[in-house]
C-alpha cells in the first residue's frame, strides 16, 4: 500500500515514528519526504498489520498534525526492513 500523508508532517519526526510503528507491526517498506510537504509511506506485509499502520498514519507522532491520508494498493517487490529516505 502506498500512502500520502498531508498536514504538518515534515520536521516533526514523522518518518522515524512511522518506521518504529511499522517495525513493531512487522510491516516493511519506506517513508520519505516529498517536495510538496507531504510524507509518502510505502507499506508491505500482512493486510491486517498494514491497515493498522494506515490507521496510525492519521495520528502520527505527537508534534504532527495530519489533515489527510490517501492510500492506494500497489504491486511492489519483496522489501526487507523499513527505510527512511
Spans of model-derived segments:
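Intrinsically disordered, low-complexity, mixed-charge
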Residues: 1-85
Amino acid at each position: 500500500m502506498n500512502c500520502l500523508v498531508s498536514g504538518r508532517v515534515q520536521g516533526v519526526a514523522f518518518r522515524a515514528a512511522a518506521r518504529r510503528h511499522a517495525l513493531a507491526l512487522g510491516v516493511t517498506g519506506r517513508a520519505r519526504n516529498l517536495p510538496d510537504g507531504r510524507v509518502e509511506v510505502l507499506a508491505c506485509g500482512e493486510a491486517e498489520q498494514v491497515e493498522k499502520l494506515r490507521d496510525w498514519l492519521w495520528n502520527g507522532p505527537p508534534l504532527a498534525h495530519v489533515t489527510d491520508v490517501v492510500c492506494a494498493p500497489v504491486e511492489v517487490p519483496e522489501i526487507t526492513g523499513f527505510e527512511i529516505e
